[in-house]
Amino acid sequence: MAVASVPITHGGDRMLSSVAALNGRIFDTDPVIAYMLLSMSQEERLAYLPTYWTALIKSALLNHAVITEADDWKAASVMIPPGGYIENAWTLLWAGFLGVLWRIGLAGIKVGESPTFSLRTLLTSLIIQRLWFEFSGMTDNAKRNGLRGHKQYYYIFSLGTEHEHRGKGIAKAIMRDHQQTAQAANLPIWLEATTEGSRALYLSMGFEEIEEIRLGKGKVAADASLQSGGPGVSLWAMVWWPNRTPDAIP
């Protein structure tokens, strides 16, 4: 399928359930997501991914995110426009993300075990640490280095394709659409690639790699399984600049 022939639709709240379900399938083996949900078993994590994504994307929508789907939901993205930030504490609370944290914490409690307040607090604090202090701290530092002082930028919160439709240029069509939007506004695009495959795609579309970030270094393996002294899971902070277009857009 030629990239130019891919039909694309943009939307908002009404597309929430569809994109959350799609992301649950797309990111089923994503190492970064597995690390974020480390307190869950694989079975629990896979069952819970749509709920996890619903809360996160709802927060993105409260920050004026645009949901884009391509070719009848074969691929989709969530993009936050300049001025909106997924880390905004008030919108996270409003979106019910504390409920997600609570559920993640309870996943570590065995059936029949009496969940104590201290245990729930400990487990919930671990996911908060991974999200805010580790992930956000490292990516914020990369942004300071990579955005060259720019405060306004588009943020690709998620972008992915159904497993059976990968390699057909569908996600590439969505990204090219986003690049055209950013070019018109003369603003950069920021994202974090979470796999080698997505990193390669973005590099091919003119993105610049700013930094390889390792989460859980010394605690987990590259696939997010527990491993003392492990290398951690990788993600790549990347930026695209509009002054590289139009020639740089494939």
Where are these regions (language model features)?
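A short helix-loop-beta-strand connector motif used in the catalytic cores of GNAT acetyltransferases and
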Residues: 44-68, 74-75, 129-133, 151-152
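Conserved acetyl-CoA-binding loop-helix of GNAT-fold acetyltransferases
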Residues: 161, 167-180, 204
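A short beta-loop-alpha structural element at the N-terminal edge
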Residues: 4-25, 29, 33
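Eukaryotic N-terminal low-complexity, Ser/Thr- and Lys/Arg-rich leader segments
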Residues: 1-7, 13-14, 243-250
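Short hydrophobic/aromatic beta-strand or adjacent loop that forms the aromatic wall/cage
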Residues: 232-238
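Conserved acyl-donor/pantetheine-binding loop and adjacent beta-alpha core of acyl/acetyltransferases
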Residues: 76-160, 216-231, 244-249
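Conserved GNAT acetyl-CoA-binding A-motif
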Residues: 153-154, 181-194
